[in-house]
């Protein structure tokens, strides 16, 4: 600060800021001196600094239901990269939304009667990096479990990326739709308010990184 205690908080204003840097360094030095000359017999705080964990939870997915009915589920999926040992951009990230078509099979329908549409892709809109969304794939044919893969693997991501998709069931032979999201694995515990979920598993370089598969 100048003689009138005026300060410009701008890195390029060296005259105003270098003294602040020197002050911070001097304060640390003074504390070290106090400990050296007057700290005989003093003990450091046990378990300080506290352990902050590792990166096991650094990449995860969150879900938010936008629409649910007997025709479709519309869901926003957000992938988070919050790695911090060290913070780093990562490529190779994918996620899977698992769902069941058991209710459709009761009306002689199969996976070919389910389509997926993308309604919003933050990667494409904000960064020009379109997310790849697969067609519905079979996971367990006997149990009618399928999934859609959301693929950001070609891009380096830190922070988060959001995408909104819809799973849509065609009408059956009775001219009605019979979609039921309540038996869908990845629908578990997600509501109209975004929340982190283990039921939308996340993969790194093709290997399961976080979450639970059916």
Label the model's feature ranges.
Residues 61, 73-77, 95, 148, ...:
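Hydrophobic residues positioned within well-ordered beta-strands of beta-sheet architectures
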Residues 69-101:
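Short beta-strand elements of extracellular/lumenal beta-sandwich folds
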Residues 102-157, 164:
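A surface/secretory-pathway sequence property marking extracellular, secreted
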Residues 64-74, 138-147:
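Short, ordered beta-strand-loop transition motifs
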């Amino acid at each position: 600060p100048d003689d009138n205690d005026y300060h410009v908080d701008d890195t390029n204003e060296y005259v105003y800021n270098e003294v602040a840097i020197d002050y911070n360094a001097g304060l640390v030095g003074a504390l070290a001196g106090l400990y050296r000359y007057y700290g005989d017999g003093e003990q450091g705080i046990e378990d300080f600094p506290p352990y902050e964990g590792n990166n096991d939870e650094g990449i995860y997915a969150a879900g938010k239901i936008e629409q649910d009915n007997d025709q479709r589920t519309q869901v926003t999926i957000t992938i988070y990269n919050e790695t911090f040992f060290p913070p780093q951009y990562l490529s190779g990230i994918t996620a899977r939304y698992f769902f069941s078509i058991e209710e459709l099979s009761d009306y002689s329908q199969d996976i070919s009667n389910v389509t997926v549409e993308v309604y919003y892709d933050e990667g494409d809109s904000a960064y020009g990096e379109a997310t790849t969304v697969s067609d519905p794939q079979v996971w367990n044919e006997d149990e009618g479990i399928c999934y859609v893969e959301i693929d950001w693997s070609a891009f380096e991501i830190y922070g988060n990326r959001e995408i909104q998709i819809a799973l849509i069931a065609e009408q059956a032979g009775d001219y009605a739709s019979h979609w039921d999201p309540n038996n869908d694995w990845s629908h578990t515990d997600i509501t109209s308010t975004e929340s982190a979920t283990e039921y939308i598993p996340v993969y790194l370089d093709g290997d399961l990184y976080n979450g639970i598969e059916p």
